[in-house]
UniProtKB/Swiss-Prot annotation:
Protein family: Belongs to the G-protein coupled receptor 1 family.
InterPro entries documented for this protein: GPCR_opsins, GPCR_Rhodpsn, GPCR_Rhodpsn_7TM
Presence of keyword Lipid metabolism: no
Record gene name: Gpr88
Organism: Mus musculus
Major subcellular site: membrane
Nucleus keyword on record: yes
Ranges that cross the membrane: 36-56, 74-94, 117-136, 159-179, 196-216, 286-306, 311-331
Extracellular compartment segments: 1-35, 95-116, 180-195, 307-310
SUPFAM superfamilies the UniProt entry points to: Family A G protein-coupled receptor-like
Taxonomic lineage from the root: Eukaryota, Metazoa, Chordata, Craniata, Vertebrata
Name of the protein described by the UniProt record: G protein-coupled receptor 88
Compartment(s) where it occurs, according to its Swiss-Prot or TrEMBL record: Cell membrane; Cell projection, Cilium membrane; Cytoplasm; Nucleus
Gene3D superfamilies assigned to the protein according to its UniProt record, in alphabetical order: Rhodopsin 7-helix transmembrane proteins
């Protein structure tokens, strides 16, 4: 296709992927499947992210620190699925040459393209930062003592982290207009927004891999170290099935004039004893989670790097990389809620039929969970 380096630049800076086909009529028929994919992702992502936000805001038990970061990511993904994807789907279905806004938007749609790019950049940046905050929260939950965790994740600190994610994303988006190519100007040799996007994705991937693989390593090396957290949702985290069965019983209340003393650990039923297959399944779950992030983000990293250095990138590769990255916004709620018992109970109370089907599907791979009385609710179980 003609002028492939400039088109790849437009894609990386957040412009419409579908509008890249305007320069060549032969691509017109290939925009329809991409538009249909965007439509499906927009509908599914809007419903899924909206449902998670509604459940967390409606049910007290779901209002935990970790879920606050999940909701933050769902809000960002909702803006992408409900506001940006429908525009891409509609613009891709328009005839070639008519997919630009009226002439009062810079005569060639430059302002409208920049607006859509800013909306996409804001949503994706906050979403990726939220993934990092969730991973870091879970990693510190495993590797730090309960008192340290409580100090780090006080209410004001959590609110500050959420606000910082939006402020940082907004600051990065505001850098786009000065770097946007001027109409009629020759494309630059180095496209800094593309390189910035690639660097951000690489940093996010490194942090996620460090946190989740660190969780698996810490649990396998020292289950006793993890058990002191006494966190009632710990067994639902990737790689933590072995730790769930090692939780001590809650300490006895102090008697008159006496000090509190820990209860003698009671033997667990045979059904709750950790099995090698269950530990292997939990290790596999964290690897699958990491693979999802790698599959969704790494193609866009290489496309962004190539675009940053003005290397030609085929339109199909650009389309696939963006669709994979956008699919992460639609699948974000499922990554964190499909094995969470509290979420499943909340869904069953709202949508009985759907909740029962989801519970049956998750039960096939779920690790046996311990009761709340056995696991306790200290540290990370604190509510907002």
């Amino acid at each position: 296709m003609t002028n492939s380096s400039s088109t790849s630049t437009s894609t990386t800076t957040g412009g419409s992927l579908l509008l890249l086909c305007e320069e060549e009529e032969s691509w017109a028929g290939r925009r329809i499947p991409v538009s249909l994919l965007y439509s499906g992702l927009a509908i599914g992502g809007t419903l899924a992210n909206g449902m998670v936000i509604y459940l967390v805001s409606s049910f007290r038990k779901l209002q935990t620190t970790s879920n606050a970061f999940i909701v933050n990511g769902c809000a960002a993904d909702l803006s992408v699925c409900a506001l940006w994807m429908p525009q891409e789907a509609v613009l891709g279905l328009l005839p070639s040459g008519s997919a630009e806004p009226p002439g009062d938007w810079d005569g060639g749609g430059g302002s409208y393209r920049l607006l859509r790019g800013g909306l996409l950049g804001l949503g994706l940046t906050v979403s990726l930062l939220s993934h990092c905050l969730v991973a870091l929260n879970r990693y510190l939950l495993i590797t730090r003592a309960p008192a340290t965790y409580q100090v780090l994740y006080q209410r004001r600190h959590t609110v500050g982290m959420l606000a910082l994610s939006w402020a940082l994303a907004l600051g990065l988006v505001l850098l786009l207009p000065p770097w946007a190519p001027k109409p009629g100007a020759e494309p630059p040799q180095v496209h800094y927004p593309a390189l910035l996007a690639a660097g951000a994705l690489l940093a996010q991937t490194a942090l996620l891999l460090h946190c989740y693989l660190g969780i698996v390593r810490r649990v396998r090396v020292s289950v006793k170290r993890v058990s002191v957290l006494n966190f009632h949702l710990l067994h639902q985290l990737p790689g933590c099935a072995a730790a769930a069965a090692a939780f001590p019983a809650a300490p006895h209340a102090p008697g008159p004039g006496g000090a509190a003393h820990p209860a003698q650990p009671q033997p667990l039923p045979a059904a709750l004893q950790p099995r090698r297959a269950q530990r292997r399944l939990s290790g596999l779950s964290v690897l699958l989670l990491c693979c999802v992030f790698l599959l969704a983000t790494q193609p866009l990293v290489w496309v962004s790097l190539a675009s940053g250095f003005s290397l030609p990138v085929p339109w199909g590769v650009q389309a696939a990389s963006w669709l994979l990255c956008c699919a992460l916004s639609a699948l974000n709620p499922l990554l964190y809620t499909w094995r969470n018992e509290e979420f499943r109970r909340s869904v069953r109370s709202v949508l009985p039929g759907v909740g029962d089907a989801a519970a049956a599907a998750a039960a096939a791979t779920a690790v046996p969970a311990m009761s709340q009385a056995q696991l306790g609710t200290r540290a990370a179980g604190q509510h907002w």
